[in-house]
C-alpha cells in the first residue's frame, strides 16, 4: 500500500491537497476528495489547466498533469477536515515526461546531471530563510498613489507609542535583535509553535531564534537534505510559518528588505557533494577543503552575477544587497568571515565540511536557486576554476582601490537578468535548464522589473515635489 493510501486509511482523510510550485516560486494547490485516490491515481495523475500559471502554457495547449509524489504525503496540521498534502511533478501529456518549465522537474534534472558527471551522486543543501513577523501591514499601489505602512508593537520606532494595556518597553533596537531573551524577544512562543508545526510535517528543527533586525526578524533552522527534498521543505517551511502567524493574528513576509535602515532577510545556502557516502568537499586545503570544493567555489564566483537572476530574483533583493547591513556583496570566499559571499563554516568533523553561499535570499524559487547553484559549482569543478586566495579580512572595510579588484554581486534585478541571459551556458548543460525556460523566465521577471522601475515612488515626492 502506498504511503498516501495508508495515511488516508489511518487518519480517515477526507481531502487531498495537490501542491506544486510556479516559476516565481509560489506554491499553488488544488484539492480533491480522498475517495478518488487509488493506485491508478499515482500512475496517471490529475489533469489541470496550465494556461493560468504565469510563464507556462498558452490557452491553445493548456492541458497538463499533476503527478503526485507519494513520498511527500503528509497530513496538513492547519485544516479542520483531515487533509493530506501531496507534492506533485508537472507532466507533459503528449510525452508523459516532466514539463520543461516545471521548477521541480528542473531540480530533478540537476540531481540526475550530477550523477551523470561522475563527480558525485548526492548534493546536500541547507538553506536558512529569514523572515519578519509583523502585527499588521497595509500597502497600496495604483494610479492615485502608493504607500506601505508596517505596524509592529515590538519595533524600535514604537518606544513612545500608546498601546492597549500600556507600553511595556522591552523591544530590540535597530540591528539589536540578535539575540536577547524574552521579553525583548517577543516572538519566542510563536516561533516555538511554528517549529511544532514543522516537526508535525516531517521537518527536523535544529534551532530557532530572533534575528538582527528590529520589528520581528526571525529564523528557524532545520536540518539539511538532498536538493529536491530540501526545496520541497523550504516550501513547507514557508507554509507553516505563514499559517501559524495567521493563527496568532500576525502576518509574515519573506521579502528580502521590508524595512529601510535595518538588516534584510537572507537565505544563506549550505552545500556539499557526496560520492559513495563520502563528503567530496573535505580535504587538506584551505579551511579543510578539497580541490573539488575550491573549484565548486570558483564556479559560483565566476557565475555569481548570472546566479543572481535565480538566487535574488526580485527588485527588492537589491535593496538588501548593499554594504552596511551584513549582506555580502563581494564575490569572495573565506573561513568563518561573514563579510564574504561564500563562507566555510567551522565544523567538528570532515563529514560535515561544506560551503555557505550568503548572497541568496528567500524570494528565490528554491528549486531554481538550488539547481542553478549546483550547476555553477559543477562547472567550476569540470573546468578546475580556482577561486584564488581567500579573503580573510573584513571586506566591508576595504579601501576603494582594494574593493574594486574583487567582483561584486549585481546591483539591480535588471543587471542580474542581463547577466543570466548572456551567461546561461553553464545552466543548459545536460538539458537541466532549457533555453526555452530561461527565455520565459527572463520575460516574466523583466515584466516585474519594468513595472517597479516605471512606477512613481513616494520618495520621489519627498525629493522632487517642490522643484
UniProtKB/Swiss-Prot annotation:
Keyword hit for Endoplasmic reticulum: no
All copies of domain GS beta-grasp, residue ranges: 11-95
Positions with a binding annotation for Mg(2+) 1: 128, 268, 356
GO molecular function: ATP binding; glutamine synthetase activity; metal ion binding
The reaction(s) this protein catalyses: L-glutamate + NH4(+) + ATP = L-glutamine + ADP + phosphate + H(+)
GO BP of this protein: glutamine biosynthetic process; nitrogen fixation; nitrogen utilization
Domain GS catalytic intervals: 103-467
Statement: the UniProt record of this protein carries the keyword Cell membrane: no
Binding site for ATP: 206, 270-272, 338, 343, 351
Enzyme class: ligase
EC number: 6.3.1.2
Pfam families associated with the record: Gln-synt_C, Gln-synt_N
Subunit: Oligomer of 12 subunits arranged in the form of two hexameric ring.
Family that this chain belongs to: Belongs to the glutamine synthetase family.
Biological role: Catalyzes the ATP-dependent biosynthesis of glutamine from glutamate and ammonia.
Protein name: Glutamine synthetase
Amino acid at each position: 500500500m502506498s504511503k498516501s493510501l495508508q495515511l488516508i486509511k489511518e487518519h480517515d482523510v477526507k481531502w487531498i491537497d495537490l501542491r506544486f510550485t510556479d516559476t516565481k516560486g509560489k506554491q499553488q494547490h488544488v484539492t480533491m476528495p480522498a475517495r478518488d485516490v487509488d493506485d491508478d491515481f499515482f500512475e496517471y495523475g490529475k489533469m489541470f489547466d496550465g494556461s493560468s500559471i504565469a510563464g507556462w502554457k498558452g490557452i491553445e495547449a493548456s492541458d497538463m498533469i499533476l503527478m503526485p509524489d507519494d513520498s511527500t504525503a503528509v497530513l496538513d496540521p492547519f485544516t479542520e477536515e483531515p487533509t493530506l498534502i501531496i507534492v506533485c511533478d508537472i507532466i507533459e501529456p503528449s510525452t508523459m515526461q516532466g514539463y520543461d518549465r516545471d521548477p521541480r522537474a528542473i531540480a530533478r534534472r540537476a540531481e540526475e546531471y550530477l550523477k551523470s558527471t561522475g563527480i558525485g551522486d548526492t548534493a546536500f543543501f541547507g538553506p536558512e530563510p529569514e523572515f519578519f513577523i509583523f502585527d499588521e501591514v497595509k500597502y497600496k499601489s495604483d494610479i492615485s498613489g502608493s504607500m506601505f505602512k508596517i505596524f509592529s508593537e515590538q519595533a524600535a520606532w514604537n518606544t513612545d507609542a500608546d498601546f492597549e494595556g500600556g507600553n511595556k518597553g522591552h523591544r530590540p533596537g535597530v540591528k539589536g535583535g540578535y539575540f536577547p531573551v524574552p521579553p525583548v524577544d517577543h516572538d519566542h512562543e510563536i516561533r516555538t509553535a511554528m517549529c511544532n508545526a514543522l516537526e508535525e510535517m516531517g521537518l527536523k528543527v535544529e534551532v530557532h531564534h530572533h534575528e538582527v533586525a528590529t520589528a520581528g526578524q526571525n529564523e528557524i533552522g532545520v536540518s539539511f537534505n538532498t536538493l529536491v527534498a530540501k526545496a520541497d521543505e523550504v516550501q513547507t517551511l514557508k507554509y507553516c510559518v505563514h499559517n501559524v502567524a495567521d493563527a496568532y493574528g500576525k502576518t509574515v513576509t519573506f521579502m528580502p528588505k521590508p524595512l529601510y535602515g535595518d538588516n534584510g532577510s537572507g537565505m544563506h545556502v549550505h552545500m556539499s557533494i557526496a560520492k559513495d557516502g563520502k563528503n567530496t568537499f573535505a580535504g587538506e586545503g584551505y579551511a579543510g577543503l578539497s580541490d573539488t570544493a575550491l573549484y565548486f567555489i570558483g564556479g559560483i564566483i565566476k557565475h555569481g552575477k548570472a546566479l543572481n537572476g535565480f538566487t535574488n530574483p526580485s527588485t527588492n533583493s537589491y535593496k538588501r544587497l548593499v554594504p552596511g547591513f551584513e549582506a555580502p556583496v563581494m564575490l569572495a570566499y573565506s573561513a568563518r568571515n561573514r563579510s564574504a559571499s561564500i563562507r566555510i563554516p567551522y565544523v567538528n568533523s570532515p563529514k560535515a565540511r561544506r560551503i555557505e553561499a550568503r548572497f541568496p535570499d528567500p524570494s528565490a524559487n528554491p528549486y531554481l536557486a538550488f539547481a542553478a547553484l549546483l550547476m555553477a559549482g559543477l562547472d567550476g569543478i569540470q573546468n578546475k576554476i580556482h577561486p584564488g586566495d581567500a579573503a580573510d579580512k573584513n571586506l566591508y572595510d576595504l579601501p576603494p582601490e582594494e574593493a574594486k579588484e574583487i567582483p561584486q554581486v549585481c546591483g539591480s534585478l535588471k543587471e542580474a537578468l542581463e547577466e543570466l541571459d548572456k551567461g546561461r551556458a553553464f545552466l543548459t548543460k545536460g538539458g537541466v535548464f532549457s533555453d526555452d525556460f530561461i527565455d520565459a523566465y527572463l520575460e516574466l521577471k523583466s515584466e516585474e522589473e519594468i513595472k517597479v522601475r516605471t512606477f512613481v515612488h513616494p520618495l520621489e515626492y519627498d525629493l522632487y515635489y517642490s522643484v
